[in-house]
């Protein structure tokens, strides 16, 4: 019986380890007026992983980040066409490398200075 429990625990931990995303995003060096390597996003807020709120959210979502110095965008929506009618961003415009978390968290971001 103890052997079965040990196998169950080992299998569960292995599954969790494989399913937990590990993100390696380094500092972005794109100019602040272009977004050639990522996606343009309108984010409600942004900050670094040292920010307690962002660190807590990353922890709750089991998102492991390593050596990230770029900004993290929170609650972002993609901006598809710059200057098109109806497109506006009243919050923060960011260019982000990694949006694998349905817009809730975007990683590897830099601020973009454009008027939408």
Curated annotation (Swiss-Prot):
> Signal peptide span per the entry?
1-19
- The intrachain disulfides are 35-95, 42-89, 43-76, 96-109
The record's induction entry says: Expression is increased by carbon source limitation.
Glycosylation is annotated at: 44, 100
One GO cellular component term noted in the UniProt record for this chain: extracellular region
- Keyword annotations: Cell wall, Disulfide bond, Glycoprotein, Secreted, Signal
Q: Which InterPro entries match?
A: Hydrophobin (IPR001338)
- What's the main place this protein lives? secreted
Q: According to its UniProt record, what is one Pfam family this protein matches?
A: Hydrophobin
Give the subcellular location. Secreted; Secreted, Cell wall
GO: which molecular function terms?
structural constituent of cell wall
Give a short account of what the protein does: Aerial growth, conidiation, and dispersal of filamentous fungi in the environment rely upon a capability of their secreting small amphipathic proteins called hydrophobins (HPBs) with low sequence identity. Class I can self-assemble into an outermost layer of rodlet bundles on aerial cell surfaces, conferring cellular hydrophobicity that supports fungal growth, development and dispersal; whereas Class II form highly ordered films at water-air interfaces through intermolecular interactions but contribute nothing to the rodlet structure.
Hey, which family's this protein in?
A: Belongs to the fungal hydrophobin family.
Quaternary form? Answer: Self-assembles to form functional amyloid fibrils called rodlets. Self-assembly into fibrillar rodlets occurs spontaneously at hydrophobic:hydrophilic interfaces and the rodlets further associate laterally to form amphipathic monolayers.
Name of the featured protein: Class I hydrophobin 1
Source species: Pleurotus ostreatus (strain PC15)
Q: Which gene encodes it?
A: vmh1
């Amino acid at each position: 019986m103890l052997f079965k429990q040990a196998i169950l625990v080992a299998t569960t931990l292995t599954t969790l380890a494989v399913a937990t995303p590990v993100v390696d995003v380094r500092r972005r060096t794109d100019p602040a007026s272009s977004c050639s390597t990522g996606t343009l996003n309108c984010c409600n807020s942004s900050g670094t992983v040292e920010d307690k709120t962002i660190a807590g959210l990353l922890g709750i979502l089991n998102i492991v980040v390593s050596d990230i110095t770029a900004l993290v965008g929170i609650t972002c929506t993609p901006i598809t066409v710059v200057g098109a009618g109806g497109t506006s961003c009243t919050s923060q415009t960011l260019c982000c490398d990694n949006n694998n978390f349905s817009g809730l968290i975007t990683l590897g971001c830099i601020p973009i200075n454009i008027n939408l």
